Amino acid sequence: SGHRRLGQRAMANLKCKNFFAASGPPSVLLSGLAEGADQLVAEIALESSWRVEAILPMPLAEYEKDFTYAAALARFRALLARCHRIIEIPLASAVDRDIHTISTPRDGVTREQQYRNLGRYLVEYTQTMLLLWDGDVSAPKPGGTAEVKLMCDAALARQDDPECHGVRRVIH
């Protein structure tokens, strides 16, 4: 997980390359492929012979509306084409809502809930969470990197519970 706008892109790039080089044999990266950190990490994972699985926070056509620049959307589509598997997170309260309730970019609570559900999915199904961000958890946005970090902290606090799955290590 990470910020869409990486302030120190070169440092993030180096950290990612070091992470993948030190991780042993290739494995699987789960990623939302969002602009910024997600796409950077996915590219380096693919260069390092890892499989990448795209975990989209909503149906593809809706998610593509969140890419603000044509170049970012093209990069997303190119990475998506290289993914081993694509999973779309079901719409929150799908019984009560249809696709049109989230049809405008940044449509408040519903869209935020989809990003929050993506964060929950990643925390539940990953063993190591790589965070590229500024470290500020003072005002977490729903589904944002700071909130995902807080979810990771909660999962780590429960890691001795045999019923607990998910994140065992956080790197940032």
Put a short name on every predicted segment:
Residues S1-H172:
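Acidic/glycine-enriched connector segments
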